[in-house]
Amino acid sequence: MNNAIKLNSIFTELSKKKKPKLIGRGIGCGKGKTSGRGHKGQKARSGTSINGFEGGQQSIYTRLPKRGFNPIRRNICSIINVGDVQRLIEAKKIEKNSVIDKEILHKLGFIKSIKDKIKLLNKGKLNERCVFHVDFASEAAKKSVTSIGGSVEILS
């Protein structure tokens, strides 16, 4: 038991705090005058280096080809499935026979903003009657909602 290592008895040279190297304090410190930056040139100047410069090698963004296209006026639609609504009804977050619109979906966290457009899709199964106020709806979703006795009202 006497040979056990204790935290208060451990001592190594590494545990001492290493003092920082003095830079730019005359030739006696070893890193004086130019402070390890060499003479003149772009890298000797103050400020940051060039973004994407790889020492003359062709940079990564010029090596890789351009791909794709991002339209400026892209229609961003939040998708809600009929099965998701059924799960919310079963979890008693939405009442049966209620009106489902942007405000309710925003409160439940289905859409990020009330300004987002909503599209109703027919994934899953709906057993309860509901009235939907959405921007878009697939034909299959409309058919499944109306077959139960609900309705889909297109806003836009």
UniProtKB/Swiss-Prot annotation:
Region ranges (Disordered): 25-49
UniProt feature coiled coil, ranges: none
One GO molecular-function entry: structural constituent of ribosome
Biological processes, Gene Ontology terms: translation
Keywords, comma-separated and alphabetical: Ribonucleoprotein, Ribosomal protein, RNA-binding, rRNA-binding
InterPro entries: Ribosomal_uL15, Ribosomal_uL15/eL18, Ribosomal_uL15/eL18_sf, Ribosomal_uL15_bac-type
GO annotation, cellular component aspect: cytosolic large ribosomal subunit
Ranges of compositional bias, category Basic residues: 34-43
Function according to Swiss-Prot or TrEMBL: Binds to the 23S rRNA.
Annotated family: Belongs to the universal ribosomal protein uL15 family.
PANTHER family for the chain: 50S RIBOSOMAL PROTEIN L15, LARGE RIBOSOMAL SUBUNIT PROTEIN UL15M
Subunit structure: Part of the 50S ribosomal subunit.
Name of the featured protein: Large ribosomal subunit protein uL15
